[in-house]
Curated annotation (Swiss-Prot):
Subcellular location: Cellular thylakoid membrane
Record field: catalytic activity: ATP + H2O + 4 H(+)(in) = ADP + phosphate + 5 H(+)(out)
Binding positions for ATP per the UniProt entry: 170-177
Top-level taxon: Bacteria
CDD domains: ATP-synt_F1_alpha_C, ATP-synt_F1_alpha_N, F1-ATPase_alpha_CD
Topology term for the membrane: Peripheral membrane protein
HAMAP family: ATP_synth_alpha_bact (MF_01346)
Organism: Prochlorococcus marinus (strain NATL1A)
Record-given protein name: ATP synthase subunit alpha
Role noted for this protein: Produces ATP from ADP in the presence of a proton gradient across the membrane. The alpha chain is a regulatory subunit.
Amino acid sequence: MVSIRPDEISSILKQQIADYDKSVSVSNVGTVLQIGDGIARVYGLEKVMAGELVEFEDGTEGIALNLEDDNVGVVLMGEALGVQEGSTVKATGKIASVPVGEAMLGRVVNPLGQQIDGKGEIATTDTRLIESIAPGIIKRKSVHEPMQTGITSIDAMIPIGRGQRELIIGDRQTGKTAIAIDTIINQKGQDVVCVYVAVGQKQASVANVVEVLKEKGALDYTIIVNAGASEAAALQYLAPYTGAAIAEHFMYQGKATLVIYDDLTKQAQAYRQMSLLLRRPLGREAYPGDVFYCHSRLLERAAKLSDAMGAGSMTSLPIIETQAGDVSAYIPTNVISITDGQIFLSSDLFNSGLRPAINVGISVSRVGGAAQTKAIKKIAGTLKLELAQFDELAAFSQFASDLDEATQKQLGRGKRLRELLKQPQFDPLNLAEQVAIVYAGVKGLIDEVPEEKVVNFARELRDYLKTNKADFLKNVLSEKVLSEASESMLKDAISEVKSSMLAA
């Protein structure tokens, strides 16, 4: 028979009483009622806030977007294969945030800031909220520094300033991404941090962009945020805000940053998908009523900060894809009204061989003029007007049989200007080279050069300046003005190249 030892029992009880933990944990918990199409309906979660992160049993995260009387609509950030009806959901009390900092440079991340390039974890402890309020009026300064794209037609006629929002708009396959990538490549040595946000793109296209940037030595100062076409709609919707948050970190440290959103059409479509699945009321083109706010709160985060705030800047280049050149559709008109100008790419110009295929007539920069350097402003003033007049004359001349000499001369110059502005992909020009090329065209110094040789002339002029007139390049780049001495050097170079071409 087992003997009972009261002393041992009492010592065990005393030990357990001594070890008793009085702390009580209270968590806001709910239950999944319904799951499908990346949306979960959750019962409970009474104290959850709009936009709050919630966590499912299997570790999947979601965002509470719809707060209804009897349930909460949650969008899932991931596949959520382990989430089922009856699973428990816990409110985290946090809003989505991403890692930020120098360690992100040269990396490819997803919209949650997790690495997807296989180079190991990102060693940074700094984080920033994905959604944050844009700087107010007092914290800003007017745009006054140029953001050189390296594309002559943009820097001469549609100049972009640091802190500006310039829309790149056009049909598919018209070179929108090419302009954005050229701009990133042109920031080499300028101490500008670039963020490229790919939304709904093919993985092969993003891999190609990474490869080009690596080849050109531009990946060292670039961060790529990728939400591919196969990702959940919630991640495609979040990606641009993640890119803005990463750039903001550097902006508030006093650095210049450039963010490219490629493209916001796909983000709007992802947001529409989420909203329709959440049973939100729909508006024009089935987009929800707050799709304008979705884009405006993103693009308002671009700013040129005041000196008191560190004088940093964030320049945004959102991309919008149009259908058959229709810029009056809902999303294009929304983003045009939010941004400080647009670069319109035409498929007709692209197919006719003019690349970059910029339609100068309807492209505009509303604030960039104040940021344009004096050197190019001085000579490019008449360029846009001449090209606009050429377009009118070219249309008119199709119906006219005999044209007077002045009209023929103007048409000839317009054609040569068009040829001069042609530029191969991934070959940005510096300021001095742009000044030289625009000067040659506007001053009529290449009117005798045959039209088919103009592209070669531009290339040879660049090579000649690099080898024989290095002082010209150095002076213009350092002084940012075209002095009389530089102008005479340029005239000599143009006449040398022209005479050697005409003699050949």
